[in-house]
Amino acid sequence: RPTWFPTGSFRWPCYGVITSFFGPRRASVPGASTYHEALDIANSYGTAIYAADGGTVTLAGWYGGLGYCVKINHGNGFVTTYGHNSSLLVSVGQHVYKGQQIARMGSTGISSGPHCHFGVTRNGTIVDPLNYLP
């Protein structure tokens, strides 16, 4: 039975192709940062976005350049961010379990096409998501 408590390990937030890695990059669209603080995973509009681990939704709405965004506090020092969604399936305060669908992929905010901007923060520091994915 799924639980919203963190398992201590992450799953991939969606299926797709990595189009931008964490770290320095050339801005893909005007206004985009040249230091990328996340992993971009591209697929088609509407592709399911899943919670990387159990936790509590702390943001579900418009978040500037990330467009429609979800943030989940996993309660163990980790916060994950899922940006550029076309629609959101969760609300602030909601408990979610690892693998629960939380959004649908889109291209909202500053974006060049449909993808999931997947960010990981550990104890307040932005870190490379690839270091925490299987």
Regions found by a protein language model. Give the residues of each.
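Alpha-helical oligomerization segments with coiled-coil/rod-like character
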Residues: 1-5
